């Protein structure tokens, strides 16, 4: 083993986390075996025995949304029964999708010292964060992923703080998704018989946004690790753009079986987050999902997390309780909920139980 590689493997946390090389830095060294720090327990790896190959999440064509009320009904049904669905003919131009994917590659191809300017130790703002894995300090086994996380405050702050390699494309993607986000949330509220979205509800549903750029390098021994471990999102909705490589798996409702989310050119994946599960009193389901590592290809994805504001209190919507439903969840300060999620390793649906009424 070359001396440089031997030195890196003996100080992986420094190389990957503190020096900003990420797992891309490891992959670029041509590793032939997965470092032990990334070997996941067997129960956290996906196996062929737990995957259903002839089933997948719904694909909903939005082209007739304005004229066919069934389209809105299909969105609500998918949110209830799957918590995940893909949308096509959504109005976001294909070139916008392609440009933000290209910008993601452009950022991660920057030298490590350039990317590391945005790390937890070096970034001038908590709203811009480059990192690796999920919570390296809390994980027994690391995840095979690097990421850039950008919390949106204003165009002015983005212009000042977001990396120039991907800033404009990230903002354009977010802006182009705004109309479909609002329409989806309005449709999902209608399914709960909530007909008016006032200022308070608008804040609860979409008061803040974060866009991530995820990079999953080609991996030696991909069957021993994960790109992302089992989790559900803390958002109201997540709007996900994935590339053509594949690897996203979703747990079927009330099952231990998983289905693959096949890439569809031009499609956007939508999933319900914990905040919407709580607001809907459990009607809409925030579902566990995970990403496998790939031994042949690099993979990217670009999620937009649509969230309440940090100082919002989330709980079942009053309209649901007024109609006689019993509250399944207590009221929780959203920032407390998010802190609970980020202080530990990925652990399936444990976070939403934090808000359950016992």
UniProtKB/Swiss-Prot annotation:
The keyword Translocase does not apply. 2-oxoglutarate binds at residues 216, 299, 301. It catalyses: (E)-feruloyl-CoA + 2-oxoglutarate + O2 = (E)-6-hydroxyferuloyl-CoA + succinate + CO2. Keywords: Dioxygenase, Iron, Metal-binding, Oxidoreductase. It is an enzyme of class 1 (oxidoreductase). Pfam families: 2OG-FeII_Oxy, DIOX_N. It comes from the Eukaryota. Belongs to the iron/ascorbate-dependent oxidoreductase family. This is Feruloyl CoA ortho-hydroxylase F6H1-1. It comes from Ipomoea batatas.
């Amino acid at each position: 083993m070359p001396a440089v590689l031997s030195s890196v493997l003996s100080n992986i946390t420094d190389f990957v986390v503190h020096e900003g090389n990420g797992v891309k830095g490891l992959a670029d060294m041509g590793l032939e075996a997965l470092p032990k720090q990334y070997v996941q327990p067997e129960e956290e790896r996906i196996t062929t025995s737990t995957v259903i190959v002839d089933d997948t999440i719904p694909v909903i064509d939005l082209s007739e949304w304005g004229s066919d009320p069934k389209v809105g009904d299909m969105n609500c049904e998918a949110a209830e029964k799957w918590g995940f669905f893909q949308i096509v003919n959504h109005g976001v131009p294909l070139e916008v999708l392609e440009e933000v994917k290209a910008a993601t590659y452009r950022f991660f191809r920057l030298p490590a010292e350039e990317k590391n300017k945005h790390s937890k130790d070096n970034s001038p703002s908590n709203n811009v964060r480059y990192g690796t894995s999920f919570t390296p300090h809390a994980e027994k086994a690391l995840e095979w992923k690097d990421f850039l996380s950008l919390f949106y405050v204003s165009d002015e702050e983005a212009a000042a703080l977001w990396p120039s390699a991907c800033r404009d494309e990230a903002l354009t993607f977010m802006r182009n998704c705004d109309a479909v986000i609002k329409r989806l949330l309005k449709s999902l509220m209608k399914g709960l018989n909530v007909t008016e979205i006032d200022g308070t509800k608008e804040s609860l549903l979409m008061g803040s946004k974060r866009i991530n750029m995820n990079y999953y390098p080609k991996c030696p021994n991909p069957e021993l690790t994960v790109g992302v471990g089992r989790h559900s999102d803390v958002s109201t909705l997540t709007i996900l753009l994935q590339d053509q490589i594949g690897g996203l798996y979703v747990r079927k409702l009330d099952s231990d079986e998983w289905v693959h989310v096949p890439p569809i050119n031009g499609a956007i994946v939508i999933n319900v987050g914990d905040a919407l599960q709580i607001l809907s009193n459990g009607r809409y389901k925030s579902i566990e999902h995970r990403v496998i590592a790939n031994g042949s290809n690099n993979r990217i994805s670009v999620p937009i997390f649509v969230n309440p504001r940090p100082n919002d209190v989330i709980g079942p919507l009053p309209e649901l309780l007024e109609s006689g439903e019993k509250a399944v969840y207590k009221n929780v300060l959203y920032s407390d909920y998010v802190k609970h999620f980020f202080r530990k390793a990925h652990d399936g649906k444990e976070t939403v139980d934090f808000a359950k009424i016992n």
